[in-house]
Each structure stands twice: as structure tokens, then as C-alpha cells.
């Protein structure tokens, strides 16, 4: 596919305030941005998992205790993910870049082109797109590990990464007791239940609020703030769950996240010289 370049007659200059009609919200990136990790390897470790006993009462007689029990071991499983490439390009002709004073559309005396620099505008707009692509990948990314230079590394997102402690709602509205049941599942899996956050879309958020009203319960607004993101909260029998209107979620899907355990990893880019 050939490049599409910004030229004088393809990208016209206008005066007036700029408004982006696209969706640029990236709340998950904002919340976890302060915990970024770096790596020098395209594949990185997210952790190891192992399981010890669930708790039982041993039955060992004095006679049996004189002989060592049969040996056994605890095995471990390593979990990994991969980094992937996000890349955009812009092209502006020298003639276009030097022709920002020629205005199209309605012109009022003493107005000037907005933006005043085409290259700066194009780069900033592409960065907004990349940020949104990263947010989408954090949520809905489908894992693929490259096996050659011609194949693609694709980061595993949260939806795909969560394979246990799931609940199928069968198209039913999500209510407070459903949230409580998910917290119970997490507790039953021996995972921390402090600071859990329900990352949901607008429909699910409305369902939770409606259920709270019908049952005489309260959703506490702005109960907590992380990196400028205000989270509401509800109380379950096991603990407080925060609520947030997330982005890039598949329809009918909500995520119950421990935001303190979520971070992103990026490769350290080498410096280049020309």
C-alpha cells in the first residue's frame, strides 16, 4: 500500500478550535502507568504458580512416625506474556508544511490556521491512536508468540488471561450478589480480596446501580482515587469492591481486577543516531 501524505490540497488548513470526535479515553493505562516495568527480552515472565495442600489433619501413629514418609514434591508452572510492536507513520510534504498560512472554509479577519504546524498535529493525532490501541490490547489482546521474523508477537490481554474464577451470566443483568459471588470465588482460590475493582461498561454499571437501588443499598461515588481516576464502591460480605466505567471491554463482559497486581511491561528502546 502506498503512503498517503499530507499535501496542500489533500489536507486543508482551517481556523477554529479543534475537536477530536474519536474515543481517546485510556483509564486502565492511566491507573497502571506508574508501575511500568522494563525488559530487554520480547517475552517476559508474569509469575510462577504452585499449589500446596488445602489443609487437612494428618493421621500418623507413633509407630509410623519412626519411618520417614514417602517423598513428594511441589511442581511449579511459569506464566509468560510477550511485548508487541505499536507503530504508526506520518508524511507531510515540504510544500504543505510551509503553506500553513493558506486558509480554506470560513475566514474571519486576523484568524490563523489551527493547527499552526501540520507535522506536530499529525504526530499528536497518531499518538492518540497508539494510546487507544494499547488500551484495547491491554483488555482484549489475543496472545501469539512469534516463531520467525515474519510472524507476529501479540500481547495477551486481561480477558484472555483470566481463565479461572469466571462467572457466566447467560445474558442476565449483573447485580450486587453476583459481584459478591465473584469475590467469594477469588477468596476460595486463596487470592487477595483487598482493593478489587469491577471494570465494566456503561450497561453493566447501570445494572449494578439499579440493583443497588432496588435492594436499598448504596453505591458510594468517588470512594477512592488512583492517578486521578475516581472509583465508586460497593460493600460485599467479604469486602469492598470498587467500580469503574472502563473502556474497550467486549459487550457483556466485566472484569474483577486487583489493580495493585496489574502493570505493563515495555522494551527499552535503543538510542539511534543519524
Where are the regions a protein language model picked out?
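Short, surface-exposed linear segments at secondary-structure transitions and domain or protein termini
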Residues: 253-255
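Flexible, glycine/threonine- and acidic-rich loop/arm segments that mediate assembly and lattice contacts
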Residues: 1-242, 247-250, 260-267, 273-274
Amino acid at each position: 500500500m502506498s503512503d498517503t501524505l499530507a499535501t496542500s490540497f489533500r489536507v486543508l488548513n482551517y481556523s477554529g478550535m479543534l475537536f477530536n470526535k474519536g474515543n481517546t479515553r485510556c483509564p486502565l493505562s492511566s491507573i497502571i502507568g506508574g508501575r511500568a516495568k522494563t525488559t530487554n527480552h520480547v517475552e517476559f515472565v508474569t509469575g510462577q504458580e504452585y499449589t500446596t495442600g488445602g489443609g487437612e489433619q494428618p493421621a500418623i501413629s507413633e509407630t509410623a512416625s519412626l519411618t520417614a514418609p514417602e517423598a513428594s514434591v511441589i511442581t511449579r508452572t511459569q506464566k509468560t506474556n510477550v511485548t508487541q510492536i505499536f507503530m504508526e507513520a506520518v508524511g507531510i510534504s515540504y510544500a504543505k508544511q510551509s503553506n500553513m498560512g493558506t486558509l480554506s472554509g470560513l475566514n474571519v479577519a486576523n484568524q490563523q490556521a489551527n493547527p499552526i504546524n501540520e507535522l506536530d498535529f499529525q504526530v499528536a493525532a497518531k499518538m492518540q491512536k497508539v494510546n487507544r490501541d494499547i488500551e484495547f490490547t491491554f483488555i482484549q489482546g489475543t496472545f501469539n508468540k512469534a516463531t520467525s521474523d515474519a510472524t507476529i508477537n501479540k500481547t495477551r490481554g486481561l480477558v484472555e488471561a483470566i481463565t479461572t474464577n469466571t462467572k457466566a451470566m447467560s445474558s442476565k443483568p449483573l447485580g450486587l450478589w453476583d459481584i459478591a459471588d465473584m469475590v467469594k470465588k477469588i477468596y476460595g482460590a486463596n487470592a487477595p480480596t483487598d482493593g478489587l475493582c469491577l471494570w465494566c461498561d456503561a450497561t453493566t454499571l447501570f445494572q449494578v446501580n439499579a440493583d443497588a437501588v432496588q435492594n436499598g443499598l448504596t453505591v458510594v461515588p468517588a470512594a477512592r482515587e488512583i492517578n486521578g481516576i475516581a472509583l465508586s464502591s460497593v460493600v460485599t460480605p467479604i469486602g469492598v469492591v470498587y467500580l469503574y466505567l472502563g473502556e474497550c471491554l467486549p459487550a457483556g463482559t466485566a472484569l474483577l481486577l486487583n489493580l495493585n497486581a496489574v502493570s505493563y511491561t515495555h522494551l527499552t528502546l535503543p538510542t539511534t543516531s543519524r
